Amino acid sequence: MCTAVTYQAAAFYMGRTLDYDCSFGEEVVITPRKFPLPGDYAVIGMAHVADGYPLYYDAVNEKGLGMAGLNFVGNAKYRQPEDGRCNVPQYALLLRVLRQCATLAQARAFLQTVNVTGEPFGQYPAAELHWLLADRTGALAADRR
């Protein structure tokens, strides 16, 4: 089980646990502004890099919006791709949101347009996730049940 928390005092804090008894090769990863993906914001967080792509566990962008992908085993449900929708595989959602959204309000609006799919990344199975998003204005939990 993974846990995430936020705390607002003089500054905003966000943290999470990664409750595994082994390592999956996670490391601190920076995705710069000019990375060849949609969006404009730089991102830093914990990720496993596979085939040059950062598979983020959690991260924050340069505007202060943070997001964590948390295990939701047995409860996560993803949809099939739909024509005319913004189809985003579950492994790409965190990076897509943080690259494109500066605030929690923007992230909430963007998530209303997204169809989260269960497409796996290479040989990795689709992770069963829900997400915590937060900035200094508040927090929200997102899932696709």
Please name every model-derived segment.
Residues D83, A92-L98:
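Second-shell loop/turn segments in exported
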Residues M1-C86, T113, G118:
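A contiguous strand-loop segment
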Residues C101-R145:
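Accessory structured domains or lobes within enzymes
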